[in-house]
């Protein structure tokens, strides 16, 4: 028996471990929709959209802005602002501990990044929610960074684009977070009075106080395919009305069919489509869009499991 262990079993285990270690962590990704095993470098070329089923995966705020804005001339707004636990809030865990954990996980100070720059050469300011930071919830810093972006648009007479991905107002900041709904809505009213366009792009998911304020106040409301958009979640609604909801309820396609949003745009088309739209709204020449050259990638055989 001992010879069998030494000669057969142990070498087999060692070969298995070597095989596992030869596949770098994060090199493969499973699509949450069709479960296809995708090569990470190939997925990056498609902007985290599954090439098999067109599922638009969730991406971070910085990745979102990197995709949307021109490379040159970017400047982050409100980067110095940090959240403060003014209420000394505690549920199952202290709020300050939740903040520390979220900051460590994401590398961000809070759940919104605002950045000035250009889109196809046209001055623009953009904000993007970081859903990985406490569900993209809106607190005082998120509201303030949004307002600073809007004020930049007012001062520089340029359009404002926001990419929303949020579970709503941040519970741990109580009334302070609810006040951000009014604060962000008020600054968007100023943009409208000045005739400056605000485009709201709804990504998966957008709920609660964010959907009830800034996310649905765009002059044009755009959504990515299959994004979940609503106020309360489907399960909560079903329990309240005691009825089964229609298929695809709260998906962007359902909202488009019922007139709640204006258009659905794939991630790869956002730059040219919004660039043309903003140029028309600002009475500027149609910008020239040059599609990036995508070099072919040699995809190695996918592992059996990841």
Curated annotation (Swiss-Prot):
It is found in: Cytoplasm. Zn(2+) binds at residues 31, 34, 50, 53. One of its GO terms (cellular component) is acetate CoA-transferase complex. The keyword Thylakoid does not apply. A zinc finger (C4-type) spans 31-53. Coiled coil: none annotated. The keyword Transport does not apply. It comes from the Bacteria. It is an enzyme of class 2 (transferase). Binds 1 zinc ion per subunit. Its main location: cytoplasm. Pathway: Lipid metabolism; malonyl-CoA biosynthesis; malonyl-CoA from acetyl-CoA: step 1/1. SUPFAM superfamilies: ClpP/crotonase (SSF52096). Its EC number is 2.1.3.15. One of its GO terms (molecular function) is zinc ion binding. InterPro entries: AcCoA_carboxyl_beta, Acetyl_CoA_COase_Trfase_b_su, ClpP/crotonase-like_dom_sf, COA_CT_N, Znf-ACC. GO terms for biological process: fatty acid biosynthetic process; malonyl-CoA biosynthetic process. Belongs to the AccD/PCCB family. HAMAP family: AcetylCoA_CT_beta. Component of the acetyl coenzyme A carboxylase (ACC) complex. Biotin carboxylase (BC) catalyzes the carboxylation of biotin on its carrier protein (BCCP) and then the CO(2) group is transferred by the transcarboxylase to acetyl-CoA to form malonyl-CoA. Acetyl-CoA carboxylase is a heterohexamer composed of biotin carboxyl carrier protein (AccB), biotin carboxylase (AccC) and two subunits each of ACCase subunit alpha (AccA) and ACCase subunit beta (AccD). NCBIfam families: accD (TIGR00515). This is Acetyl-coenzyme A carboxylase carboxyl transferase subunit beta. It comes from Pseudomonas syringae pv. syringae (strain B728a). The lineage of its organism: Bacteria, Pseudomonadati, Pseudomonadota, Gammaproteobacteria, Pseudomonadales.
């Amino acid at each position: 028996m001992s010879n069998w262990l030494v000669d057969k079993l142990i070498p087999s285990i060692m070969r298995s471990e070597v095989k596992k270690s030869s596949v770098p962590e994060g090199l493969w990704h499973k699509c949450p929709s069709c479960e296809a095993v995708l090569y990470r470098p190939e997925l990056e070329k498609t902007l985290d959209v599954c090439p098999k089923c067109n599922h638009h995966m969730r991406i971070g705020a910085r990745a979102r802005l990197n995709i949307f804005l021109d490379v040159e001339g970017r400047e982050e707004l409100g980067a110095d602002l940090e959240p403060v636990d003014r209420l000394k809030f505690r549920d199952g865990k202290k709020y300050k501990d939740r903040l520390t954990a979220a900051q460590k996980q994401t590398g961000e100070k809070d759940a919104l990044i605002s950045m000035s720059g250009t889109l196809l050469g046209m001055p623009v300011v953009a904000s993007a929610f970081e859903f990985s930071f406490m569900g993209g919830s809106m607190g005082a810093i998120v509201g303030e960074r949004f307002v600073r972006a809007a004020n930049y648009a007012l001062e520089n007479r340029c359009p404002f684009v926001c990419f929303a991905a949020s579970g709503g107002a941040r519970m741990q900041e109580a009334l302070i977070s609810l006040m951000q709904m009014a604060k962000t809505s008020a600054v968007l009213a100023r943009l409208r009075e000045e005739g400056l366009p605000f485009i709201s792009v709804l990504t998966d998911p957008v709920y609660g106080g964010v959907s009830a304020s800034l996310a649905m106040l765009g002059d044009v409301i755009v959504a990515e395919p299959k994004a979940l958009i609503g106020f309360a979640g489907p399960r909560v609604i079903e329990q309240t009305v005691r009825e089964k909801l229609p298929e695809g309820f709260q998906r962007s396609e359902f909202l488009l069919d019922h007139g709640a949003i204006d258009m659905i745009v794939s991630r790869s088309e956002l730059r040219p489509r919004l660039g043309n739209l903003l140029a028309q709204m600002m009475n500027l020449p149609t910008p020239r869009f040059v599609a990036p050259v995508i070099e072919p990638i040699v995809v190695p055989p996918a592992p059996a499991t990841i």
